Amino acid sequence: MTELTVLNGAAIQSLLTIPMAVRAVEQAYLEKSTGGAALWPMVFHEFTPGAADLDIKSGHMNGLGLYGMKVVSWFGDNPAKDLPALYGTSLLFDIHTGAPRALLNAGPITDFRTGAAGAVGAKYLARPDAETLLMAGTGALAPYLIAAALYCLPQLKTVYVANPHHPERSAAACAAIVPQVEKLLAACGGCHAAITAAPSLETAAKQSDVILTATPAREPFLKACLLYTSPS
């Protein structure tokens, strides 16, 4: 008889860590680059244009012996019904038999994965002497991106937090983000950088060695001329 593991959001939050997420993302990238993993075409459907939709993202990893999918549903009217606007659910299957293996709340997995993906990119692409990070975006993903970046780049000393669309909210958002970052890093050395609200997006961009973004922007908000260029 097939055993199906079912984990809700609280259980996943208690089990998953930043180091685990970083290792998983690195392994996924490595397997994809060598043909051992693949992403399949995304399915997108609008129930009501601009008001309700879903997307299905799927793929496989031979190294884990699994294939799976994540179904994300967005119903914009849900908050008025005291329901979340977003629902995310992941299903995993045995790649050899097709047997279902896990039913997971995809919310926290997405948070950790997104943070790890940004940080892994910075780990391999940033200069070794990078000391300053700009986090452009102050939503739910920001603490995970910052925490993962600090884990992957222990030389970082300063983190600027900016809300590109509402700069006046940056300070309050930063104050809320700091304890979340500290909690995420508590089990892996703690937070070693000063996290402060950006004086302005432009100023912080000019001073930063690494920039991570997580916003719903539909138009560019960072110009190339703002990016810091090392004198070396």
Locate predicted features.
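N-terminal ligand-binding/catalytic initiation module
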Residues: M1-D111, A117-A119, A126-D129
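Glycine-rich adenosine-cofactor-binding loop
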Residues: G118, A130-L150, N163-H165
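NAD(P)-binding Rossmann-fold cofactor-contacting core
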Residues: P154-L184
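Short acidic low-complexity segments
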Residues: C191-Q207, A224
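Rossmann-fold NAD(P) dinucleotide-binding segment
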Residues: R218-L227
